[in-house]
């Protein structure tokens, strides 16, 4: 059963909350990745990659976002992007890039530790100031408040578009990425993969 649209506060307010949560320097919030198995009365159930099913209450101001398939052509100067990267041979190399809709510019801006895998990785949400082509790769110069990064985007990197989502996208069977609030009691945001898409972050 899909949740009523009335369960969601305005997307604008939810986006602000999501940004504040993700912008915390220590990034203490837990993440849950898995497949949506139920959504009813403000609570969702998710089967994790480990096969466990967890029940998660949504915060009243929870944000709802959708990722859809994209490609390297979307990575352009002036775009605001999120990138999960790893240190490889003395440089940062992207595993995935999510290109934000312009309405989400500035969301969770910064460069901070991430948890895509057990080995150290970082999330960088920043503006692309320059794009260079180096062989088949692209090298991005990125600027954010308080710093800058240079990250290589190989052709193997997953690229998705990231936008706000209506409640009807919260459908059973969809892959989801969930950001819990600081005390772990409720979901602050849910990133939903479009049909056939897994949130890569």
Give, region by region, the residue ranges found by the protein language model.
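Short, flexible, surface-exposed loop segments at domain boundaries
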Residues: 2-5, 17-61, 65-201
């Amino acid at each position: 059963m899909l949740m009523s649209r009335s369960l969601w506060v305005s997307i604008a307010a939810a986006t602000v909350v999501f940004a504040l949560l993700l912008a915390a320097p220590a990034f203490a919030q837990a993440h849950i990745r898995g497949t949506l198995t139920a959504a009813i009365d403000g609570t969702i159930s998710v089967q994790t990659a480990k096969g466990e099913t967890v029940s998660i209450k949504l915060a009243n101001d929870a944000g709802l976002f959708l990722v859809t398939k994209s490609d390297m052509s979307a990575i352009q100067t002036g775009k605001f992007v999120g990138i999960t990267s790893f240190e490889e041979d003395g440089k940062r190399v992207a595993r995935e890039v999510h290109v934000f809709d312009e309405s989400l510019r500035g969301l969770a801006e910064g460069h901070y530790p991430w948890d895509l895998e057990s080995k150290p990785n970082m999330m960088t949400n920043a503006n692309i100031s320059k794009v260079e082509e180096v062989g088949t790769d692209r090298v991005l110069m990125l600027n954010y408040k308080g710093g800058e990064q240079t990250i290589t985007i190989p052709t193997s990197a997953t690229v998705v578009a990231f936008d706000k989502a209506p409640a009807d996208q919260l459908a059973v069977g969809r892959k989801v990425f969930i950001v819990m609030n600081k005390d772990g009691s409720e979901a602050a945001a849910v990133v939903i993969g479009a049909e056939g898409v897994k949130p890569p972050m």
